[in-house]
């Protein structure tokens, strides 16, 4: 970190008097390379809802900080995760998602692996001196099912997800009691030209909701909205009303609420008014100024109603582009000579619905990994 300004020990520790990271922290490849190792290679990263891996042979692939990962449910129903490369010469093994065969076959030299990662066959290995079959298996990494979702961790010494996000699963299930019944209904994939922290900053405040999200703000009432911080996660919640511009609520729903959870380091779980569906924003940082995002929408029913289809299109064509335009503009603006280098975090004493104290909390956590 020699070429990058060191952060003070108490950076953003007091949210009432706090400024954002110096702009270099959003643009520097040196900073990003440090965060790859200090944060993403040592944290539990949420990659999917459990329904995508519910049955034996189900698999998905994800790219996280340049690593290609495969998560697969074995014939024994055990969920496992591996680096998605052949140990022979490094060719990638599986692509996309779907149903794996009973063995994984490398497209390059046809080495085959069982779904537990062990080597099944390496052609001609009987004629290769001192061939070590035991050390020719796929390389595993940690995986855990938690709160209805699937998390991976590249740190072989990592403890459980609950240690990283204490009490999060309990609170999420209180907000949405049907998590385990959810099924993927839509996914919007964007390679967003913005640093991962810009995207989290944007999520962690509703100061922008009125000006930038008129449809959302017509339903979720910012004057009845709170933001609480917890250990490595935060919760934004508030009361909502039915809106023709966004969430059309069933009249039978009493006291409808919105819940928005951010979890370390960069996954956002939303339980919209009605509490019977969810949206999740998965962030997979690519480089200092690019973040691959999956915006997933989950319902309990497979055959969607017209209202659900209309809501998906509102997310696709209205709400999602609103946020993408914001973070992309910020990333460009951070590099302007007209930006003074840091922005004041607008925390108010009453911690109102438009207070930015959530950003200060997040940035303080990140700063602890830059010591």
UniProtKB/Swiss-Prot annotation:
A GO biological-process term: carnitine metabolic process
Positions that bind [2Fe-2S] cluster: 86, 88, 106, 109
Cofactor note: Binds 1 [2Fe-2S] cluster per subunit.
Record pathway: Amine and polyamine metabolism; carnitine metabolism
Amino acids binding Fe cation: 208, 213, 323
Record carries keyword Cytoplasm: no
Superkingdom to which the source organism belongs: Bacteria
EC number(s) from the headed UniProt entry: 1.14.13.239
CDD domains: RHO_alpha_C_2, Rieske_RO_Alpha_N
Regulation: Inhibited by EDTA.
SUPFAM superfamilies in the record: Bet v1-like, ISP domain
Record flagged with keyword Iron-sulfur: yes
Protein name as annotated: Carnitine monooxygenase oxygenase subunit
Organism: Acinetobacter pittii (strain PHEA-2)
